[in-house]
Amino acid sequence: MNSHTKQKIGVFGLGKTGISVYEELQGKCDVIVYDDLKANRDIFEELYTNNSIAALSDSRWQNLDKIVLSPGIPLTHKIAGIAKNFNIPIISDIDLLFEKSKNLNFIAVTGTNGKSTTTALISHILNSNGLDYPVAGNIGVPALQAKASKDGYILELSSFQLDLVKTFTAKIAVLLNITPDHLDRHQDMTGYIAAKSKIFDRMDKDSYAAINIDNYYCREIFMLLQQEQRIKLIPFSVTKILKNGISVVGDKINDNDISYKLPFNKNLQGTHNCENIAASYAVAKIIGVESKKILESISSFQSLPHRMQYIGSINNIGFYNDSKATNAISAVQSIKALDNIYWLAGGIPKEGGIEEIKPYFSKIKKAYFYGQAKEIFAKTAKNIVDFVICDNLEQAFDLAYKDAVGDNAEVKNILLAPSCSSYDQFKNFEERGELFMKLSKRHCEEITK
């Protein structure tokens, strides 16, 4: 990385991102590192025997050319104060990847919900059609660990990551939706929207932005960019057919004034996935993939784990894992896509609880609440939908399964859409989803014995 050769650089945060940054920079410049968590420092010392760890009291932090901050570190942290006091620029791993690959196309995807599925769907479409676009970023692959590419990268970017970027410039940017989230980090919606809007920074007339104009906050950003006239804009909608833009309404995808039949894919059910499809189609068309080829790729897409993941169906009971639905807005999307639902929800509740889901309670046959949120959710559901309070996810699943087996309805669905973060009982949403999948498969095996 020539632009950083012989510079003094600090890496703060030693999770996956921080480690990837250190591995990129070591031997090319003078690097010091730190993490507030002793466990992360210990892991680093096991991996690397050199003396790179320096506490923030070390004066070397005051004499750096740059500090690379991991996205989990808020800008209110002491390290940000040191950077400000000593005029040290804070950058991100996203900037580092961009600076060494400026000749390639960068596709950036953000939004409160749907980022990972859209990122994966774009990648599937492009790579199925002979192009080379690895994914990286918030999807679980640190930017600097993305495999080498000849065409470009598709980056899923969270508001935390966008807060840190300084030089990164997207060729194509996607804004899926904005709803209240991470307000503890951004203070209020104004701060959150400002962070999301940074995806369009430094883009010019040769760049493209695909924006969901059904969403109020996204529409406001779209209109502001229209006034600026510095980016080529492609609006998309799932509620109305646009004469100039991309629409997914019913079983049709409309590309300006041309309509195509949308292939059914059980892994892409629900309004939220219509948004993901519209955005992915727009990006693929910009890149130059033919409409017919895009539709073929959509039909063969396999959903990501824990994101409205269809696990299987037996005796008319379908099992759906939407563990990634960590807020009510996200859970609404999976609930809207199904009927006769045995709903598993709980964990650490987000602001507003499940109020957003109340209009869709008629789709829920019975709810099973667990974790810290169980009493709060029960209060919202009282006298509207039948529910049971459970100790944990496993108990909730067992009760839901028993009730579904006894239901004579033609179609029944057991849905994990927690509407909460997972940290009261699990390490993360992935561990929560893995347990649900294990339980689903175990019960399917019992039925078939």
Curated annotation (Swiss-Prot):
It comes from the Bacteria. Its EC number is 6.3.2.9. GO terms for biological process: cell division; cell wall organization; peptidoglycan biosynthetic process; regulation of cell shape. This is UDP-N-acetylmuramoylalanine--D-glutamate ligase. GO terms for cellular component: cytoplasm. ATP binds at residues 111-117. It comes from Rickettsia felis (strain ATCC VR-1525 / URRWXCal2) (Rickettsia azadi). GO terms for molecular function: ATP binding; tetrahydrofolylpolyglutamate synthase activity; UDP-N-acetylmuramoylalanine-D-glutamate ligase activity. It catalyses: UDP-N-acetyl-alpha-D-muramoyl-L-alanine + D-glutamate + ATP = UDP-N-acetyl-alpha-D-muramoyl-L-alanyl-D-glutamate + ADP + phosphate + H(+). SUPFAM superfamilies: MurCD N-terminal domain, MurD-like peptide ligases, catalytic domain, MurD-like peptide ligases, peptide-binding domain. The gene is murD. The keyword Nucleotide-binding applies. Pfam families: Mur_ligase_C, Mur_ligase_M, MurD-like_N. Cell wall formation. Catalyzes the addition of glutamate to the nucleotide precursor UDP-N-acetylmuramoyl-L-alanine (UMA). Keywords: ATP-binding, Cell cycle, Cell division, Cell shape, Cell wall biogenesis/degradation, Cytoplasm, Ligase, Nucleotide-binding, Peptidoglycan synthesis.
